[in-house]
Amino acid sequence: MVAGEIIKGVAAEITNGSSSSVVQKYLDCANQVAPDPGNTTWVLLSTILVLGMMPALAFFEAGLLRSKNTLSIITQIMSGIVVLTVMWQAFGYSLTFGPDQKGIIGNLDHAFLINVSYDDCSPNAPNIPAAAYAFFMMMFANITPLLMTGAFAERVKFKAFIALTVAWEIIVFYPVAHWIWGGGWLHKYFGVLDFAGGIVIHTSAGVSALVIALYVGRRKDFEKYGGEFPPSNLPLATIGAALLWMGWFGFNAGSALAAGNIATSAVASTQIGGSFSAIVWIILSAAKGKPNTVSVINGVIAGLAGITPASGYINSQYSIGLGICLGLASYYSVVLLKHKLHIDDALDVSSVHGLTGIIGSLAIGFCAELSVNPNGANGAFYGNPKLIGTQLLGVVSVAVWAAAWTWVLLKIIDATIGVKIDESEEELGLDLVEHGEFAYHNISLQGNENHYSSVINSHDFFK
């Protein structure tokens, strides 16, 4: 980072009344002679690990859905990756991490990654090249809206998915990420903490997922199956979950932006939290019948999502209790939403990601220690109960923003191109209706051969 940019940045932050820690980021960058090779290597490896989480998410979700919708979820996620990558490179990074505009959003100074150096650091990451940080954060920006696909699976048109993903990323994710990670109002003025995305990613996506599930309504035969449609390929789902688990170490420990004690602590917290949450799910599922595969993998994902915001701020021993709380809360949230309220969040995104992200973010207010991460704060257990209120402010602000805008975007998209497929198309499956393909060629059309022909003849890609 050149001297002029450093001076300009420090002056702007002082003028805006930023905390000394925010100003210090610029000074740390100025004092850094060159990016550290070891830290740069770790962040680049973490970037690759988080990228791998996205096809892993596709495997996980495809295996849990019905076979006639396998390719649709894979196509949504893989298409989302490339669209969101282009957006981030063109303007997303700049809106998120560009110079702050009244605490709300960045500007377009770094559009198309202009002046994002491959040689010098950035204030957000004083030990690595600015470009390495930009590409690492690209993966977070990419995966966030893709998490929502599990909530509305098997019901939403592909073009509606693309429209919602693009609009949601711009209106929800970029501002929220700026508020907490990019020098915006929640961190600058209140000190809201989110190590790797419990608020920015899991709360925003989880709350939005619930809104979408409510908006699009239940799938056909929801009551018949009690909300638990038979999965098509549990081994595929398990492989996806295992790859997600592995990638989560890059997600959480990579957020330390250095290969050191904070990254090590995040690795420990991630493994412990995910494991204890899974144990809770195994015990509860066994108590109701038999321990099943879906419970194991959902329990792991719930724990990993919930430990995400706290992993770099708390002693890893707290991950035991937090993991247990996350397992209990997510399990009974699924029972409440799906089996009591009959909300068809197909893959329980609101419970496994949303609720756990909220709990983990609030846990920072109790368990955070400056001795673990000097860039954080002490929580209530260490003499600072105000941090609980700070974290609550962050969670509520992001949840309300995400929920409100998601509903508005759905209404606009529905009024223009439509959101949901009709019931007869749902019967055939999105693989055929939206993409003209089958994942498995032994799928029965179940007496719908005539409708199959009409669907084929109605789509341009068969002409």
From Swiss-Prot:
Residues 61-76, 149-160, 216-233, 287-293, 338-351, 414-463 are cytoplasmic. GO terms for molecular function: ammonium channel activity. The chain crosses the membrane at residues 40-60, 77-97, 128-148, 161-181, 195-215, 234-254, 266-286, 294-314, 317-337, 352-372, 393-413. Keywords: Ammonia transport, Cell membrane, Cytoplasmic vesicle, Endosome, Lysosome, Membrane, Transmembrane, Transmembrane helix, Transport. GO terms for biological process: ammonium transmembrane transport; asexual reproduction; intracellular ammonium homeostasis; positive regulation of aggregate size involved in sorocarp development; secretion; sporulation resulting in formation of a cellular spore. Residues 1-39, 98-127, 182-194, 255-265, 315-316, 373-392 are extracellular. It is a multi-pass membrane protein. Ammonium transporter that mediates the excretion of ammonium. Controls ammonium homeostasis during growth and development. Ammonium has been shown to function as a morphogen at multiple steps during the development. This is Ammonium transporter 1. It comes from Dictyostelium discoideum.
